[in-house]
Amino acid sequence: MANFISLKKNEDILDTIKKQQKIHSNQIVVYFRKTNLKNVRLAISISKKKFKLATQRNRIRRLIKAWFIAADIPIKSYDIVVLVKPSFIDGSFVLNCNNLKIILQRIINKEKR
């Protein structure tokens, strides 16, 4: 899924969250909604209250974006908002990637229904 676009408008992010289609784990919460666009739009939200250092927030953002670029998951025309929980730092990169993969597989399964 190398071709994703950043979801930047606050109203689009809020619409995705209000849609209330979400999947969560201990490390992350993923809100998603179907759109008419050809690409996936991705927003990563990391709370400043939970992660004080900007270097931590930027590292988490880079890790999640790198995983989305490297993953070969056939999701098209979705808006995805990823909310990161504080336990994300405690887990290893492999564990966090597996959680993301499981969550995106669940999104694909919901799409097939």
UniProtKB/Swiss-Prot annotation:
Q: Which GO terms describe its molecular function?
A: 3'-tRNA processing endoribonuclease activity; ribonuclease P activity; tRNA binding
Work out whether the entry's keyword set contains Nuclease. Answer: yes
Keyword Mitochondrion attached = no
Query: Recorded E.C. number(s)?
Result: 3.1.26.5
Provide the Gene Ontology terms for cellular component. Answer: ribonuclease P complex
* Disulfide cysteine pairs (residue numbers): none
According to UniProt, the reaction catalysed is:
Endonucleolytic cleavage of RNA, removing 5'-extranucleotides from tRNA precursor
Task: Name its GO BP terms in alphabetical order.
Answer: tRNA 5'-leader removal
Q: Which InterPro entries does the protein's record reference?
A: Ribosomal_Su5_D2-typ_SF, Ribsml_uS5_D2-typ_fold_subgr, RNase_P, RNase_P_CS
Mind listing the UniProt keywords for this protein, alphabetically? Endonuclease, Hydrolase, Nuclease, RNA-binding, tRNA processing
Q: SUPFAM superfamilies annotated for this entry?
A: Ribosomal protein S5 domain 2-like
* Source domain of life: Bacteria
Q: What does this protein do?
A: RNaseP catalyzes the removal of the 5'-leader sequence from pre-tRNA to produce the mature 5'-terminus. It can also cleave other RNA substrates such as 4.5S RNA. The protein component plays an auxiliary but essential role in vivo by binding to the 5'-leader sequence and broadening the substrate specificity of the ribozyme.
Report the family membership: Belongs to the RnpA family.
Oligomer and partners: Consists of a catalytic RNA component (M1 or rnpB) and a protein subunit.
Its recorded name reads Ribonuclease P protein component
List the source organism: Ureaplasma parvum serovar 3 (strain ATCC 700970)
